[in-house]
Amino acid sequence: MKKRNAVISLIIMAALVAGLCYTAIVGLGADKSGSISKIHLGLDLAGGVSITYQAVGETAPSSEDMADTVYKLQKRVDQYSTEAQVYREGDDRVNIEIPGVSDANQILADLGRPGSLYFIRETDDDGNPNYGYMVTEEGSLGYGLTRTIEELDATGDIVLSGTDVANATAGYQSDSMNNRQIVVELVFTDEGGKKFAEATKRAYDQGETIGIYYDGGFISVPRVQSPITNGQAIITGEESIESAQNLASTIRIGGLKVELEELRSNVVGAQLGQTAIQTSLRAGIIGLALVMVFMIAIYFIPGLTASIALVIYTMLMIIILNAFDVTLTLPGIAGILLSIGMAVDANVIIFARIREELKTGASVQNATDTGYQKALSAIIDGNVTTLITAFVLMWLGTGSVKGFAQTLAIGILLSMLTALFITKFLMKIFYGIGFQDKKWYISSKALAEKKVEPIDFTGRKKIFFGISIAVILAGFIAMGVRGASGQGALNYSLDFVGGTSTDVTFNQDYSLTELEQQVVPVFESVTGDSNVQLQKVAGSNEVIIKTRTLELAERQELTQKLSEQFGIDESSIQAETISSTISSEMRRSTMIAVILALALVLLYIWLRFKDIRFGASSVIALAHDVLVTLTCYAILRVSVGSTFIACMLTIVGYSVNATIVIFDRIRENMQMRKPGEKMDDLVNMSVTQTLSRSLFTSLTTFIMVFILYIFGVASIRVFALPIMVGIVAGAYSSVCISGSLWLVLRGWFPPKHDDSGARPKQNKLKAKTDEEKRRLQEKRVWDKTLV
């Protein structure tokens, strides 16, 4: 690229970056489209309530009944928030999410009461109106009650209820003039038909209406044209078939016999959500800045281009979250910050390759092109395997775990875009501007190191294997001791055992003794149970208290007592309840997800490397990383909750990335293997050549997660700590174990032919003389002996 073109390209790129930053931070237009403030926040960030119901009864509900139930609940939650969502899960479950509400406990109470449908007489026996056209409580004109439902019921002015309606359907019918009209047809039960006959006779005689009242408001007030004695009625006058269908559905759901049981509920105070956002943003900014400083300090101009690409990556992530309306949760933020650390991985692989080429005497331009070419396969393989784990999470995960998987998958795809295209384009721009000397790409000391002395990793494999076995055994011993003492092998959260967890942020930092003396008695007085578990969150006033499953009334009483005795705002109290049904499903999903991810990774590596030994070695190394992380959970008593599956699969995806880079180098070096070179030496050289990549990538990702752990809220720390352990375990297994494992398996199951993964290119030149034929034949024979 010529200097003039490079300068123009740099100006365009600067304008592009500025535009992306403006869009992501400020937004476009009056509605600020694309800005970070417009991202749809999950309940753990926006505050609110979520609840999962399951239909119970002797017979399974029909699909129509469940659809009506969803419609019924959606109508009820719309009054709380325009962003409220109600959706089915499977055949018999309904999920409700209502963000940004203040009195979440009251909403839970309202949702717990079934919506009632009533048919009400227009006047009582004395001629007083039971309802009329008036200004409603919402300030609009419409029909409203003059007396309460209880008063109407006591005087007998409620003539039918929802259970008296057998069915309601919308359709078309011809009137007496043969005109097609929209109607709602009602069919009553036998008892309901008798009641309706009496009510319509009275209404017809007095020229009155019968109001149909549902869940706090009138849905229709039809005038009675004649006594209806056949148990069927027609309502006319609807403006559209859609409005008729809505009316029919509302009448049907008013008489639903579907009984709903609460499986899970979560109440998050708005203040807790705001704190989580602020701390996570702070962690992201600090972590990103540290990674950028590290990259520039280590890699000079390439590090600068990677830093610019990281800024572009971050801004694009914000814009994409807006464009696809992805709901951002706390684990989702963790996924973004983790993917920022992982985005550095591709750049580190490329820059390490570029430096290797520079050491051979190649020019900066040639070294850059060759570096990108040689790094491509490792980058693709590593990112595909990480995507596999993300897709498994999206498939088997629920709620916040699925949000984590979505942001992680988006981050992986964006990281490939920025590393393979944007960073390379920036490298060409800086080269064209004038940064053509090798000193801008590699230190003189590193450039002088022409030969890399291999480290004998395989010779120390017994030591490395022994360390790993000892750590894993320590974890199993800890689980056994804890289990025998009745504490539980692992510190299972509600997601795995069920119960109620109350997260309280006090106005001061109480000691554990003070909590046991002052707070525990409050919980015991409400629960009537002495089994109350306390967990202080280090560095904050936050305390997590676990109890048996609490009913809604008990949760409300507990919130009131905590607020009165400790002066806590209700927005600082978060409660979550999970049934044993959900917890057993969570345990099963976790096992399936981990096993499925390992199997898919094994299959991909086997197909990609055409060597089952590479795949088996990778899976064993991944199992090692998972078990070491499990040791962390066992010894440090880290809470095993809904993010456990996300944590384990993240470690699987991240660790296999590092292992693939080493295996890719082994495969490459086998194609250039020298006569008589021992396989141990080849493996040691391959691991040594990729050592800087393994260490630098692990360090940058560790920095991001460590900052997240330092500044994050409790739920983020529970996720970040095992991830840090997994990063260290993954780096250790990739460098110290994976190559030796492959070597051991190769010894146990020796190849029958050249299994390097790719054969050397054959010389396609035609020999013109006998001497040339002989030399060419010798070369082909020599190529075939490189096993």
Regions found by a protein language model. Give the residues of each.
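A structural signal for conserved, well-ordered secondary-structure elements
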Residues: 1-787
